[in-house]
């Protein structure tokens, strides 16, 4: 099988690494890819926003299957255009990708189909949103409706913080993503990420993970795209997974189909496990970044036939087998992230991978043959262990061998699970 992978982040490096191991693979291309992905795939300098160019390349190379990694091309309808050209594609349609592309769309779906989630209101102007906040009080959550690279959500612990977040959205801090705002109830509990495939009819539960959104140790500082993750998430017991499937995922699949937007691809449900049970915080319509890295480390099965079955409506014919081990990833980011940071800082050394640990590339590039950091989140150091404690020790041991002066990381990834393991 000839496969084209769209994307250039740590998530796509993990997908490329896993897809390349498949005995079914004849050729793997990645557009645009990164220097880490180049170890597993032929890099193609395609502009993925130019759908006609992507289709032309796929036809020229007789590509059998396209896997779309990031959310932006999905929300832009790349999967629709590829499928219309007769090319099997992993990833939802533009209409179904609204589950991630619009927070309000998802909340309205939850309201229609009785999916547990926090109470909410949608606003297109600042003043009514502020009136609502004053009436509700804090803590309260303010979300830019559209795609904001994981940074459009403010969990406001005070009313003043909530009002400032509303101003940020309507003053253009998140571009067009903030032209509408969702204000929702603060949910108290433990967060978890749940991943599940759907071909529009069948659902296949994958695995659970826990992400670390805030930039600083002890979950302090501003939100980021994610500073690290581990899998499995202990809070997601088999009973909780079953409830999540029954109360959240299955009604979403049937609801989307009923509304004329059948969903094919991966559901990444951001959940809050409250006293009542699982409640939906948000949906993403692609593998998490950095959660994908820990999922791929734990997946025993060949990934390629599972993705292909999702794309071709035959998900009921495949299964996914997982290692019992835990996996943990630590994000190395550029100093200053998620604010302003220096670009093109040199990365002097990346340590060799072992059976237990490896480094995935995210925001890296080659400049004059030398590896440099081009993004905010740059490397993902990922390791296995019998438990999270062991996986964490291995990940930090490898992370400390990376030679990059402008990099930093959180030192406490996995702290909640480790506290549980010690107890």
From Swiss-Prot:
Binds 1 Mg(2+) or Mn(2+) ion per subunit. Residues 107-312 form the ATP-grasp domain. GO terms for molecular function: ATP binding; metal ion binding; phosphoribosylamine-glycine ligase activity. Its cofactor is Mg(2+); Mn(2+). It holds the Pfam family GARS_A. InterPro entries: ATP-grasp, ATP_grasp_subdomain_1, PreATP-grasp_dom_sf, PRibGlycinamid_synth_ATP-grasp, PRibGlycinamide_synth, PRibGlycinamide_synth_C-dom, PRibGlycinamide_synth_C_sf, PRibGlycinamide_synth_CS. SUPFAM superfamilies: Glutathione synthetase ATP-binding domain-like, PreATP-grasp domain, Rudiment single hybrid motif. It catalyses: 5-phospho-beta-D-ribosylamine + glycine + ATP = N(1)-(5-phospho-beta-D-ribosyl)glycinamide + ADP + phosphate + H(+). Pathway: Purine metabolism; IMP biosynthesis via de novo pathway; N(1)-(5-phospho-D-ribosyl)glycinamide from 5-phospho-alpha-D-ribose 1-diphosphate: step 2/2. Signal peptide: none annotated. Its EC number is 6.3.4.13. Gene3D superfamilies: 3.40.50.20, ATP-grasp fold, A domain (3.30.1490.20), ATP-grasp fold, B domain (3.30.470.20), Phosphoribosylglycinamide synthetase, C-terminal domain (3.90.600.10). PROSITE patterns: ATP_GRASP, GARS. Mg(2+) binds at residues 282, 284. One of its GO terms (biological process) is purine nucleobase biosynthetic process. ATP binds at residues 133-193. It comes from the Bacteria. Keywords: ATP-binding, Ligase, Magnesium, Manganese, Metal-binding, Nucleotide-binding, Purine biosynthesis. Belongs to the GARS family. HAMAP family: GARS. This is Phosphoribosylamine--glycine ligase. It comes from Agrobacterium fabrum (strain C58 / ATCC 33970). The gene is purD.
């Amino acid at each position: 099988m000839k496969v084209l992978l769209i994307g250039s982040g740590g998530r796509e490096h993990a997908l490329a690494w896993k897809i390349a191991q498949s005995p079914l693979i004849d050729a793997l291309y990645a557009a645009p890819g990164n220097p880490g992905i180049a170890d597993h795939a032929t890099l193609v300098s395609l502009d993925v926003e130019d759908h006609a160019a992507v289709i032309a390349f796929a036809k020229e190379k007789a590509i059998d299957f396209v896997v779309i990694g990031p959310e932006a091309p999905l929300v832009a309808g790349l999967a629709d255009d590829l499928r219309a050209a007769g090319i099997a594609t992993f990833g939802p349609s533009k209409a179904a990708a609204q589950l991630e592309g619009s927070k309000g769309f998802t909340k309205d779906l939850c309201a229609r189909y009785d999916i547990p989630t926090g109470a909410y209101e949608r606003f297109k102007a600042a003043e009514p949103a502020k009136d609502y906040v004053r009436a509700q009080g804090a803590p309260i959550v303010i979300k830019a409706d559209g795609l904001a690279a994981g940074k459009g959500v403010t969990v406001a612990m005070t009313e003043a913080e909530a009002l400032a977040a509303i101003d940020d959205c309507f003053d253009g801090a998140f571009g067009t993503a903030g032209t509408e705002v969702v204000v929702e109830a603060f949910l108290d509990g433990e967060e978890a990420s749940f991943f599940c495939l759907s071909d529009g009819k069948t659902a296949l539960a994958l695995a659970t993970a826990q992400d670390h959104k805030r930039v600083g140790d002890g979950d302090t500082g501003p939100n980021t795209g994610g500073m690290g993750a581990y899998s499995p998430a202990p809070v997601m017991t088999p009973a909780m997974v079953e409830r999540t499937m029954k109360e959240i995922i299955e009604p979403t699949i049937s609801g989307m189909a009923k509304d004329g937007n059948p969903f094919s691809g991966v559901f990444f449900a951001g959940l809050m496990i409250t006293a009542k049970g699982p409640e939906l915080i948000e949906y993403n319509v692609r593998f998490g970044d950095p959660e994908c890295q820990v999922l791929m480390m734990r997946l025993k099965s060949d990934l390629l036939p599972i993705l292909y079955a999702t794309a071709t409506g035959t998900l009921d014919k495949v299964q996914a087998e997982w290692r019992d081990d835990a996996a943990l990833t630590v994000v190395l980011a550029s100093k200053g992230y998620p604010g302003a940071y220096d670009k093109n800082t040199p990365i002097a050394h990346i340590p060799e991978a072992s059976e237990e640990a490896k480094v995935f590339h995210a925001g890296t590039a080659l400049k004059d043959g030398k590896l440099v950091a081009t993004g905010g989140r740059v490397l993902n150091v990922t390791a296995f262990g019998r438990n999270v404690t062991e996986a964490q020790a291995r990940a930090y041991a490898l992370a400390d061998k990376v030679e990059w002066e402008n990099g930093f990381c959180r030192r406490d990834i996995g702290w909640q699970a480790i506290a549980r393991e010690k107890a």
